[in-house]
Protein backbone atom coordinates (compact mmCIF):
# COMPACT_ATOMS: atom_id res chain seq x y z
CA UNK A 1 0.00 0.00 0.00
CA UNK A 2 2.96 2.31 -0.57
CA UNK A 3 4.13 2.61 3.03
CA UNK A 4 7.19 4.73 3.68
CA UNK A 5 8.38 5.96 7.07
CA UNK A 6 7.92 9.71 7.39
CA UNK A 7 11.02 11.76 8.15
CA UNK A 8 12.14 13.50 11.31
CA UNK A 9 13.00 17.14 10.68
CA UNK A 10 15.43 19.06 12.88
CA UNK A 11 14.25 22.51 13.98
CA UNK A 12 17.69 23.99 14.51
CA UNK A 13 16.65 27.62 14.93
CA UNK A 14 13.98 26.71 17.47
CA UNK A 15 16.35 24.48 19.44
CA UNK A 16 18.90 27.33 19.51
CA UNK A 17 16.19 29.76 20.65
CA UNK A 18 15.25 27.49 23.56
CA UNK A 19 18.84 26.54 24.33
CA UNK A 20 18.31 22.83 23.84
CA UNK A 21 20.49 20.45 21.90
CA UNK A 22 17.91 19.35 19.36
CA UNK A 23 14.20 19.56 18.55
CA UNK A 24 12.87 17.03 16.07
CA UNK A 25 9.38 16.89 14.57
CA UNK A 26 7.82 14.13 12.53
CA UNK A 27 6.86 15.42 9.07
CA UNK A 28 3.52 13.82 8.26
CA UNK A 29 2.90 15.92 5.15
CA UNK A 30 3.91 13.00 2.91
CA UNK A 31 1.88 10.24 4.60
CA UNK A 32 0.28 8.38 1.65
CA UNK A 33 -0.33 11.73 -0.05
CA UNK A 34 -2.94 12.62 2.56
CA UNK A 35 -0.86 15.20 4.44
CA UNK A 36 -2.06 13.97 7.83
CA UNK A 37 -1.32 11.38 10.49
CA UNK A 38 -5.06 10.74 10.95
CA UNK A 39 -5.10 7.99 8.35
CA UNK A 40 -3.02 5.87 10.72
CA UNK A 41 -5.90 5.61 13.18
CA UNK A 42 -8.66 4.66 10.78
CA UNK A 43 -6.55 2.21 8.83
CA UNK A 44 -5.27 0.52 11.99
CA UNK A 45 -8.79 0.21 13.41
CA UNK A 46 -10.05 -1.27 10.14
CA UNK A 47 -7.17 -3.75 10.15
CA UNK A 48 -8.00 -4.72 13.74
CA UNK A 49 -11.68 -5.15 12.85
CA UNK A 50 -10.75 -7.43 9.97
CA UNK A 51 -8.29 -9.39 12.10
CA UNK A 52 -11.00 -9.95 14.68
CA UNK A 53 -13.54 -10.96 12.04
CA UNK A 54 -11.19 -13.36 10.21
CA UNK A 55 -9.14 -14.56 13.21
CA UNK A 56 -5.84 -13.07 12.03
CA UNK A 57 -2.87 -11.97 14.13
CA UNK A 58 -2.21 -8.29 13.47
CA UNK A 59 1.35 -8.66 14.76
CA UNK A 60 2.21 -11.12 11.99
CA UNK A 61 0.28 -9.78 9.03
CA UNK A 62 1.15 -8.28 5.67
CA UNK A 63 -1.14 -5.92 3.82
CA UNK A 64 -1.53 -8.50 1.05
CA UNK A 65 -2.61 -11.20 3.53
CA UNK A 66 -5.10 -8.85 5.14
CA UNK A 67 -6.59 -7.82 1.81
CA UNK A 68 -6.82 -11.39 0.49
CA UNK A 69 -8.53 -12.56 3.71
CA UNK A 70 -11.60 -10.40 3.11
CA UNK A 71 -14.37 -12.74 2.02
CA UNK A 72 -17.22 -10.28 1.48
CA UNK A 73 -17.75 -6.69 0.46
CA UNK A 74 -17.88 -4.48 3.53
CA UNK A 75 -18.81 -0.87 4.17
CA UNK A 76 -17.01 1.23 6.75
CA UNK A 77 -18.83 4.31 8.05
CA UNK A 78 -17.73 7.27 10.13
CA UNK A 79 -18.47 10.87 10.95
CA UNK A 80 -15.75 13.41 10.36
CA UNK A 81 -15.08 17.04 9.81
CA UNK A 82 -11.99 16.22 7.79
CA UNK A 83 -8.92 14.05 8.11
CA UNK A 84 -10.29 11.05 10.03
CA UNK A 85 -12.86 10.51 7.29
CA UNK A 86 -10.18 10.80 4.64
CA UNK A 87 -8.19 8.13 6.47
CA UNK A 88 -11.15 5.74 6.63
CA UNK A 89 -11.96 6.38 2.96
CA UNK A 90 -8.33 5.80 1.97
CA UNK A 91 -8.07 2.55 3.95
CA UNK A 92 -11.35 1.22 2.53
CA UNK A 93 -10.19 1.99 -1.00
CA UNK A 94 -6.83 0.27 -0.43
CA UNK A 95 -8.69 -2.84 0.72
CA UNK A 96 -11.22 -2.76 -2.13
CA UNK A 97 -14.08 -1.97 0.26
CA UNK A 98 -16.72 0.74 0.54
CA UNK A 99 -16.76 3.76 2.81
CA UNK A 100 -19.63 6.07 3.69
CA UNK A 101 -18.45 9.24 5.35
CA UNK A 102 -20.91 11.57 7.06
CA UNK A 103 -20.03 15.18 7.74
CA UNK A 104 -21.87 17.75 9.86
CA UNK A 105 -23.51 20.84 8.43
CA UNK A 106 -21.08 23.59 7.60
CA UNK A 107 -18.35 21.21 6.45
CA UNK A 108 -16.04 22.76 3.88
CA UNK A 109 -16.63 21.66 0.29
CA UNK A 110 -12.87 21.20 -0.10
CA UNK A 111 -12.96 18.50 2.61
CA UNK A 112 -15.98 16.82 1.02
CA UNK A 113 -14.20 16.78 -2.34
CA UNK A 114 -11.05 15.28 -0.79
CA UNK A 115 -13.11 12.37 0.56
CA UNK A 116 -14.96 11.91 -2.72
CA UNK A 117 -11.63 11.73 -4.58
CA UNK A 118 -10.81 8.69 -2.43
CA UNK A 119 -13.84 6.86 -3.80
CA UNK A 120 -16.03 7.11 -0.72
CA UNK A 121 -19.61 8.23 -0.55
CA UNK A 122 -19.67 11.51 1.38
CA UNK A 123 -22.88 12.91 2.82
CA UNK A 124 -23.14 16.29 4.53
CA UNK A 125 -26.01 16.24 7.01
CA UNK A 126 -28.05 19.17 8.29
CA UNK A 127 -27.01 18.21 11.85
CA UNK A 128 -24.18 19.20 14.18
CA UNK A 129 -21.22 16.88 14.74
CA UNK A 130 -22.59 14.95 17.74
CA UNK A 131 -25.99 14.39 16.12
CA UNK A 132 -24.25 13.27 12.92
CA UNK A 133 -22.26 10.71 14.93
CA UNK A 134 -25.51 9.31 16.36
CA UNK A 135 -27.08 9.29 12.89
CA UNK A 136 -24.05 7.47 11.46
CA UNK A 137 -24.27 4.82 14.16
CA UNK A 138 -28.00 4.27 13.58
CA UNK A 139 -27.63 4.17 9.80
CA UNK A 140 -24.69 1.76 9.99
CA UNK A 141 -26.56 -0.58 12.34
CA UNK A 142 -29.57 -0.57 10.03
CA UNK A 143 -27.40 -1.37 6.98
CA UNK A 144 -24.95 -3.83 8.55
CA UNK A 145 -21.96 -1.50 8.14
CA UNK A 146 -18.91 -1.33 10.38
CA UNK A 147 -18.54 1.98 12.24
CA UNK A 148 -14.98 3.28 12.57
CA UNK A 149 -15.59 6.31 14.77
CA UNK A 150 -12.86 8.19 16.61
CA UNK A 151 -15.33 9.40 19.23
CA UNK A 152 -15.88 7.17 22.27
CA UNK A 153 -19.01 6.90 24.41
CA UNK A 154 -20.34 4.43 26.94
CA UNK A 155 -20.42 1.02 25.27
CA UNK A 156 -18.30 2.16 22.30
CA UNK A 157 -14.64 2.30 23.27
CA UNK A 158 -12.88 -0.57 21.49
CA UNK A 159 -12.62 1.03 18.05
CA UNK A 160 -11.69 4.52 19.33
CA UNK A 161 -8.96 2.81 21.38
CA UNK A 162 -7.70 1.05 18.26
CA UNK A 163 -7.71 4.39 16.44
CA UNK A 164 -5.53 5.91 19.17
CA UNK A 165 -3.23 2.88 18.98
CA UNK A 166 -2.98 3.48 15.24
CA UNK A 167 -1.87 7.06 15.86
CA UNK A 168 0.84 5.69 18.14
CA UNK A 169 2.36 3.77 15.21
CA UNK A 170 3.62 7.16 14.05
CA UNK A 171 6.52 6.66 16.46
CA UNK A 172 7.42 3.20 15.13
For each predicted feature, which ranges?
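PLP-dependent amino-acid enzyme catalytic core
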Residues: 1-172
Amino acid sequence: AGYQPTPLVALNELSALFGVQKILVKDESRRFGLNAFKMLGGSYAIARLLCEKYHLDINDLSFETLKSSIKEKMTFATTTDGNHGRGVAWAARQLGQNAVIYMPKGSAQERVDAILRLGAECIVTDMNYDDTVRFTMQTAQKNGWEVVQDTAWEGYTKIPTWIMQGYATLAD
